[in-house]
Amino acid sequence: MKPSSGLRGLLVLFSLTWTCAGDWSAVKVRCSYFWFYAKIKPTLFHNLYMNPDEAFLGNDCPVTYVSPDAHYEFFYYSNKCGIITKTFQETLLLQTKIKYMSSNSGDTAEMPVSCVVTQQACMYHLSNETESGDDETSSEDMEVSYIMQSQNDLNTTFSLCAK
């Protein structure tokens, strides 16, 4: 009987976690030793629509880019915005939060976000051309491209490489 009740408890816990988690595609987080990138849907908090000026990363760092697919992007150095960095042997844990602060009322909401960098990582300039796609890779020589909107509206693509 005990294994059965334990299994039921896990099932209930999983159901609650799934219900509370909502849309898993609402947040995408990537990082390296030097930068932190987050891409969020404007409806991240319980399908409440956020304007770009109401969304913040960490200690009130504003949205850096609104993408054509209506997502908000944050692209900051990992030592800015109150991002907490913890080191465990060859692993780096970056922790911060996404905040919503309504401009029309006192409503606020927060969601913790974190990102892990393992082994050695490097960042180098690839090109001035934009690349698109949300393809994931699980190879050991991981290469993930990002687009950063620069001050002069040029798209600069960077790569995270871990070996």
From Swiss-Prot:
Report the GO terms under cellular component. extracellular region
* Principal location listed in the UniProt entry: secreted
Q: Does the keyword Zinc-finger apply?
A: no
Keyword set for this entry? Secreted, Signal
Q: Please tell me whether the keyword Secreted is annotated for this protein.
A: yes
Reported tissue expression: Oocyte-specific.
Instruction: Tell me where in or outside the cell this protein is found.
Output: Secreted
The signal peptide stretch is 1-21
Say what the protein does. May be involved in cell differentiation.
Q: Which family does it belong to?
A: Belongs to the PLAC1 family.
Q: What is this protein called?
A: Oocyte-secreted protein 1
Organism of derivation: Bos taurus
